[in-house]
C-alpha cells in the first residue's frame, strides 16, 4: 500500500510540474529562473542515484553475507544500466513526448530505489540497480529542454546551470551516502533517495 501511495504521489507531482512547464514555455521564448533551477536540482538528485551504492558496498556485503565480487557487481550493473539508458532511452526524446519519458522514468526510478531498500537478497538488488541506472539518465533529457526553451543569448548559461546541478549531484552523492550509511544504514539511504525523488 505504501508503494502504491508513493508512486501515485510521484506521478501526480510530476504531472502537475510538467503541465505547468508546458503552459509557460515556448521554444526560444525564455526559461523562467524557477524552472531552470528546478531542472538543475532534479538533475543532481537524479544522477546521484548512480553513486549512492559506492560507499555502501562494504556495509551491504556484511549484511547480505555475500562475496566482495558479488557486492562490487552492484556498482558495475548500475553503470551498465546508465549506459543503456543513454544509448536507448535518451534518443527517444526526439521521437516521443519528453513529458511521458520523464514521468515513466520517475515512476520506475522510485520503484527501483524502494526495491533496493527492501531487497532480501543480492539478486533483487542487481535487477533494481540495473533499472536505477537506466532511469537515472533523466538529466540528459533536461539538458536539451534547457537549450530548447532558453533565449538564444542565454542557451549556454542555462545549459551550464543544469550541468552544474548534475555535477554537484555526482560529487555530493558519495559524501551523503557514506554519512547516512554509517549513521542510519544502507537501506535507509535508499529510502531517503526514493523520498528525494518523490519531493522533486
Predicted feature locations:
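Helix-loop-helix hairpin linking two adjacent transmembrane segments in secondary transporters
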Residues: 124, 161-200
Amino acid at each position: 500500500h505504501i508503494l502504491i501511495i508513493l508512486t501515485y504521489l510521484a506521478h501526480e507531482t510530476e504531472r502537475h510540474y510538467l503541465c505547468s512547464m508546458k503552459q509557460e514555455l515556448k521554444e526560444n521564448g525564455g526559461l523562467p529562473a524557477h524552472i531552470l533551477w528546478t531542472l538543475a536540482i532534479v538533475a543532481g538528485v537524479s544522477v546521484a542515484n548512480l553513486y549512492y551504492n559506492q560507499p555502501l558496498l562494504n556495509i551491504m556485503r556484511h549484511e547480505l553475507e555475500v562475496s566482495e565480487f558479488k557486492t562490487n557487481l552492484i556498482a558495475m550493473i548500475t553503470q551498465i544500466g546508465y549506459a543503456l539508458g543513454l544509448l536507448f532511452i535518451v534518443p527517444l526524446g526526439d521521437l516521443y513526448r519528453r513529458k511521458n519519458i520523464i514521468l515513466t522514468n520517475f515512476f520506475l526510478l522510485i520503484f527501483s530505489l524502494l526495491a533496493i531498500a527492501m531487497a532480501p537478497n543480492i539478486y533483487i538488488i542487481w535487477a533494481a540497480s540495473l533499472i536505477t541506472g537506466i532511469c537515472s539518465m533523466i538529466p540528459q533529457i533536461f539538458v536539451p529542454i534547457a537549450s530548447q526553451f532558453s533565449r538564444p543569448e542565454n542557451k549556454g548559461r542555462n545549459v551550464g546551470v543544469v550541468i552544474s546541478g548534475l555535477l554537484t549531484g555526482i560529487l555530493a552523492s558519495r559524501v551523503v551516502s557514506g554519512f547516512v550509511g554509517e549513521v542510519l544504514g544502507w537501506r535507509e539511504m535508499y529510502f531517503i533517495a526514493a523520498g528525494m525523488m518523490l519531493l522533486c
